[in-house]
Amino acid sequence: VGQNRGAGKMDRVRQGVRCTQFMIWGYSIFAMVLVFFFGKYMTWLFISPSETAVVSAAVTYFRMVFWCYPFLGSIFLYRNTLQGLGYGLVPMLGGVFELIARAAIVYIVSGRASFAGVCLADPAAWISALIPLVPYYFYIMRKTNKAEEKIE
């Protein structure tokens, strides 16, 4: 990203982000299917099958969060793209949004909801982190487009 920006080839940055987003979706769908059908067996790699309560909790967690894997991948994409372009404040702000969302969900649902409710803290955090990242990425790209048009 940084090299392409330095070379003035922002079209490559756009193309890279677009291609990476497709790869994130492809990998996420694969991971969703894997976790949905084999999540219980995957936990057995780390937890004894005799620990049924722990395995059940892990499967519940998997089932609550797997649908948000594309959002998780997108956090890495947009955060690292913005950092590579030289913008550090907004990616850090995304982390703050993530932390606030995680804490808020746990505070709201703990004691009032089940374990499944607490599991929603991660998806809420991932989606919240994207709130400043995605719009800022498109703002930067639009601003760069206008600057490129003035040069031509």
Question: In which residue ranges do the predicted regions lie?
Answer:
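Short alpha-helical transmembrane segments in multi-pass integral membrane proteins
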Residues: 1-68, 109-152
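Membrane-interface junctions at transmembrane-helix termini in multi-pass inner-membrane proteins
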Residues: 69-97
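Alpha-helical transmembrane segments of multipass membrane proteins
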Residues: 33, 77-81, 103-108, 134
